[in-house]
Amino acid sequence: MVAPYMGYVEVCEALNRLTPGTGKKKSALFNSGAEALENAVKIARRFTKREAVVVFEHGYHGRTNLTMAMTAKNMPYKDGFGPFAPEFYRMPMAYPYRWPGGPEKCAEEALDVVIHKIEKELGADRVAAIVLEPIQGEGGFIVPPQGFIKGLSEFCTKHGIVFI
């Protein structure tokens, strides 16, 4: 958000100061989660020079055209609003309550499925970003099992993928 308000500048300066790392930092403020997510995807694509973005079943990301492409649920959000932006690929969510192998195997099995699908169907070298809600609210308040998010983060780091 480009604005001449000192309060915005102060918040961005505080974010930069509190964010770990010694490199040059920039902060941006947006008016909605959808706008923030669209910009995160643009930044990831520009930074990685890749186009593919991985999202998950049951996810809700917003009501803009780009975030509707990322949203899993057709009704009531997407019906009649297409065509949507390309290069979004949906993966199964680690959903302990409904995972076929049961909750105790969910993290490991779901991570294996997601990584296999990315590596074999997309190619990790094509993926700019993986977008995951830490707790999916719209999908039924799905809390991924311990180890799933950490495993995705490690996969992203290994392959130069931005984890949003």
Describe the residue ranges of each PLM region.
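Glycine-rich loop-to-alpha-helix module at the N-terminal edge of alpha/beta enzyme cores
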Residues: 1-51, 62
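Short coil/turn connectors at secondary-structure junctions
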Residues: 22-25, 48-52, 84-87, 125-127, ...
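Conserved residues at the C-terminal ends of beta-strands
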Residues: 30, 56, 133
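PLP-dependent aminotransferase-class I/II
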Residues: 60-135, 143
